[in-house]
Amino acid sequence: MGDFNERYPISYRSIREVFVIIMKIINDNFSVSTRSRNQMIDITSQIQSIVNDSGISDGDVVVYCPHTTAGITINENADPDVQHDILLTLSEIFPQRRAGYRHCEGNSDSHCKCSLVGCSELVLIKGGRLVLGTWQSVFFCEFDGPRSRNVIVQVRGQ
């Protein structure tokens, strides 16, 4: 049978070097202007546009929010009541005014909502298109608006 190296002559190092050579990484960003304190904005088209411009057909895209009172999530885009229900539930879990909050800026609830929702999402790319379910979209989640915010996008692949 021979040992492993005879049967598989490509070393881990050479595989890693080939991977690095064919992997392309594109960094981009865009602004989002929010209109209310709590809001979900569909940013799927902006992300798809960045993927289109990157020329990457297969890989993934990281969508990142560099703010402590806003986040990124993937959820249903067909029924706006879903967004309403998400924001309502988060506001019930973390009310704006709660006895015991110690953060003195008045936005402790916003920090808590951000921690629960998260600040990033990873979406696969296949054939140059975001791999999302029929009803899914990527949403920017504002928890301390209205504000102008930044979204960072990194597209990786080939």
Question: What is the predicted function of each stretch?
Answer:
Residues 17, 21-158:
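Active-site histidine-anchored catalytic micro-motif
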Residues 1-22:
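N-terminal amphipathic/basic-hydrophobic helices that include classical n-h-c signal peptides
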